[in-house]
């Protein structure tokens, strides 16, 4: 399901007095959808590229500080939409977009991770195989994953025509296991839609 933040990125506000008011309204509406999904016994996966991709796509005119303030608000609204849902039923996917561009303006994981970790979710899926973000397993040396969360690093690159050798995939997961408890790791792909 789309997060309130990503909806606001792809369907810009043209009605409400402020972006914050728009996000609040989206949060209230999406809370209904999220509850219906989990009430049906399904796992809720939230797509949240607004917390990474939107930095260089939509909010490039903002200073980094102002973007991070915006990201805080997006997490606040997301959490408001999730208040009645057990976090163990929620996955959140963060990405910088799976297009084949240079990604030279991507915001680093170390800058957004402290904000992302405030989300009331259990499972966090991140891109980590593409060449621009493959090194970011190291971020978890300094920013510890809370004990109540499970990281799903993308260990398969969804933007390449190459099929990775099984040892490459295993080594990517092993890198993460050096900085995160193995019980808190689950292999995934770089794309939340894969």
Walk through the language-model features, giving the residues of each.
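Domain-level signal for soluble alpha/beta catalytic cores
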Residues: 1-194
């Amino acid at each position: 399901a789309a997060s309130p933040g990503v909806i606001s990125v792809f369907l810009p506000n043209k009605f409400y007095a402020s972006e914050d008011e728009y996000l609040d309204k989206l949060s209230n509406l999406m809370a209904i959808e999220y509850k219906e999904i989990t009430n049906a016994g399904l796992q809720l996966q939230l797509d949240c590229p607004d917390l990474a991709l939107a930095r260089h796509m939509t909010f490039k005119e903002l200073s980094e500080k102002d973007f991070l303030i915006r990201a805080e608000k997006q997490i606040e609204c997301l959490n408001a939409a999730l208040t009645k849902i057990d976090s163990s039923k929620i996955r959140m996917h963060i990405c910088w977009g799976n297009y084949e561009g240079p990604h030279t303006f991507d915001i680093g994981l170390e800058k957004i991770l402290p904000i992302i970790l405030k989300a009331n979710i259990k499972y966090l899926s991140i891109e980590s195989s593409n060449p621009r973000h493959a090194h970011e397993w190291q971020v978890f040396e300094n920013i510890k994953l809370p004990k109540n969360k499970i990281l799903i690093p993308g260990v398969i690159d969804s933007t390449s025509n190459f099929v990775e050798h099984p040892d490459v995939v295993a080594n990517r997961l092993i890198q993460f296991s050096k900085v995160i408890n193995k019980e808190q790791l689950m292999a995934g792909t770089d794309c939340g839609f894969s």
